[in-house]
């Protein structure tokens, strides 16, 4: 059998084992996860690099001077007005000249301080970016290198041991079951009226402030997390596993974990996390769009066992009319998910997020479920303004978490099926006489 056929056949076994491990085991408490190791590596590497790439001295002075440029200009205007008054009084000519000389010297010093502050800022930015780039390289080399070594050792002992080990690794890197369980941990308290319990549960899976959220806001946060992480947590790593096996999976998870830990636009990581954030955008560019298209396709099958909500606000009429009409509460509704609305909202809103990738699956989910997602959100006590996606024909309810999870599962299974079908075709073509 040709080498390509053998590799494709082994990859099929790896994917099947990964699916079994993910669905059967998930991420139980107390069981070590590879991402924990990657996270510890990132933290220690960051600490070492921050000591190596020291922030230039004068950072406090930099902020003081830059923030007070306007005060210096105001002082200049006040001094100019005082000069005009002094020149009218000949008795104070000498004093005015001395004062002007002192002021000119002070202006020169202020200008020099501002220039030094700007130079310090540029130097600090360069050091931070360089340190962040080095961190990305070190983490990727260490994580993928260790996995390569371990898998090679397993294959050397026995080829099937290598396949099983790689399949278990891939299964641990997927988050289908764990994300479903985390989402249901939010849904169940909401259905029972336990808003505080749901708030505690949702705080475990989102980065936003959860204290301001009411029941609808909690359900909305859970739906957004499931929709976004359909790609980040399941289909994107699966995409790279189909192409490159366990090495592709660990490489992607390392990039994604770095973005999650240091890819923030705050004072600490604005420059240090630039390399990680941009690499994550590149790695997710194709998987996020593929996930969105697959999610649109699975909307062709109606939900079963989930009651359809009443949509009472507006629906889009035919293209020829191109306008909206009001609906009465007793108007018959199309069953969810709505494939046409999913495609329409995806085309319209997929670029509304600051990230080039995160709104891809979120916009599909918003359209399919007739919801309005994103919008203003609180992070660390500060309100962040975000564009809204979707038409919001109805309020978000706890059962929408179930619907979002169903879309995630369907999308993931479809990608599994496509990947295995492609690999089977590759085996057949490689063995063609």
Per-range role (PLM):
Residues 256:
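Substrate/ligand-engaging "lid" and interaction regions
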Residues 2-67, 74-77, 116-251, 263-319, ...:
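Hydrophobic alpha-helical transmembrane segments
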Residues 67-121:
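Intrinsically disordered, low-complexity repeat regions of secreted/extracellular protein precursors
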